Amino acid sequence: MLGGSAHGGPVFGGVQAPGARYILPSFEERTAYGYKRQDPYAKLFEDRIIFLGVQVDDASADDIMAQLLVLESQDPDRDIVMYINSPGGSFTAMTAIYDTMQYVRPQIQTVVLGQAASAAAVLTAAGAPGKRLALPNARILIHQPAVGEAGHGQASDILIQSNEINRMRAWLEETLVKHSSRTLEQVNKDIERDNILSATEALKYGLIDQVLTSRKTLPALVK
């Protein structure tokens, strides 16, 4: 659910905040300067790969934006790859990442592993044209935004929330039209309820450009 929480908590309907996870292993690599210990995410970052595998919130948005800006400073003409497996989350956190993706010079290739729901679906579609991919069993979910705790407070407060959610929905519709092959009328209808698309359906919808069945086709898309 595209929305927000005053405390940065989970806002995607039915999704619980992740509990304790397994310990991420670290490993050593031999370099010209000796051995270097690092974790898988650091290794991916060295290869200009960003992994969005959590809910989209202020913390994850800050992490993603920082990585985008650093990779741009390292090489502004080389692609960045963003792997996505996310249930979505905060609207404002999503727009912060979205704007940064459009702002940096490198083209952003997006690859969906598992799912890209709600806010994460928008980020998937915002990748560079021709470089938005999904694995065969990935799914993409689009729906209208919602504001947490809406409907409470004085009449003037409710009106403010109503105006804001209308603004959010208008932005979402225009953005999905921009990054898909659908019309505004089609998108308006399609996001009224949860709209779950398979990788093939997302391809037909225009949210991605290719269903990635083999890794052999991936390097050709990266400059």
Swiss-Prot record:
| Assembly mode | Fourteen ClpP subunits assemble into 2 heptameric rings which stack back to back to give a disk-like structure with a central cavity, resembling the structure of eukaryotic proteasomes.
Family according to the record: Belongs to the peptidase S14 family.
- Which terms in the GO cellular component ontology are assigned? cytoplasm; endopeptidase Clp complex
Q: Which PANTHER family match?
A: ATP-DEPENDENT CLP PROTEASE PROTEOLYTIC SUBUNIT, ATP-DEPENDENT CLP PROTEASE PROTEOLYTIC SUBUNIT-LIKE-RELATED
Please list the GO biological process terms of this entry. protein quality control for misfolded or incompletely synthesized proteins
Identify the catalytic residues.
S118 (nucleophile), H143
Q: What class of enzyme is it?
A: hydrolase
Q: What is its EC number?
A: 3.4.21.92
Major site of localization recorded for this protein: cytoplasm
Q: Name one GO molecular function term.
A: ATPase binding
Catalyzed reaction equations: Hydrolysis of proteins to small peptides in the presence of ATP and magnesium. alpha-casein is the usual test substrate. In the absence of ATP, only oligopeptides shorter than five residues are hydrolyzed (such as succinyl-Leu-Tyr-|-NHMec, and Leu-Tyr-Leu-|-Tyr-Trp, in which cleavage of the -Tyr-|-Leu- and -Tyr-|-Trp bonds also occurs)
Q: Could you tell me which PROSITE patterns the record lists for this protein?
A: CLP_PROTEASE_HIS, CLP_PROTEASE_SER
Where is the protein found, in the record's own terms? Cytoplasm
InterPro entries assigned to the protein according to its UniProt record, in alphabetical order: ClpP, ClpP/crotonase-like_dom_sf, ClpP/TepA, ClpP_His_AS, ClpP_Ser_AS
Q: What does this protein do?
A: Cleaves peptides in various proteins in a process that requires ATP hydrolysis. Has a chymotrypsin-like activity. Plays a major role in the degradation of misfolded proteins.
| Protein name, UniProt field | ATP-dependent Clp protease proteolytic subunit 2
By its UniProt entry, which CDD domains does this protein fall under?
S14_ClpP_2
Alphabetically ordered keywords of this record: Cytoplasm, Hydrolase, Protease, Serine protease
Pfam families, from UniProt?
CLP_protease
